[in-house]
Amino acid sequence: MSHENERLVIIRHAPYSSNALREGLDVALVAAAFGQTVSLLFLGQGVLALLKEQKTGAPGQKATLPTIDMLEMYDIDQLLVPQSALDALHLQVDQLVEGATVVADAGLPELLHRHSQVMNF
């Protein structure tokens, strides 16, 4: 059952590969500022946005790690990563920012169903 005003933002793009990551984070921040419950699910290359040791992008591109770090101030504390995404990128959870939570792939359908709004970036 989905809950009203619960939004799941799915991030699929790596930092600096396009504007999709930044746009997804902006949507999450705006929704949270208006009192919606927001969870972030990082899939595929999107998991790279959660790396502690993130490199900077090309000149003129804003770093995404400061935005990730301030999500908690907006009560966005669900930073979810499927185990398969970590495995595919040969990453361990300790390489990710504090607060990232590994979820079982089997639980993803229920996670999607639980949110009234799902947005992909």
Place the predicted regions along the sequence by residue.
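A glycine-rich helix N-cap at a beta->alpha junction
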Residues: G57-D87
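Short acidic-hydrophobic, aromatic-tinged amphipathic segments that line or gate anion-handling sites
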Residues: G99-A106
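An anion/phosphate-binding loop that grips the pyrophosphate of nucleotide cofactors and donors
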Residues: H115
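Short connector loops at secondary-structure junctions
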Residues: L41-L50
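Structural alpha-helical scaffold elements that stabilize or flank donor/cofactor-binding regions
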Residues: L111-L112
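Histidine-anchored nucleotide/phosphate-binding helix
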Residues: L21-L40
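Residues at the starts of beta-strands that form the adenosine-phosphate
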Residues: E6, T37-S39, Q78
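Short, glycine-rich nucleotide/cofactor-binding loops
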Residues: L8-R22, Q54-K55, P59
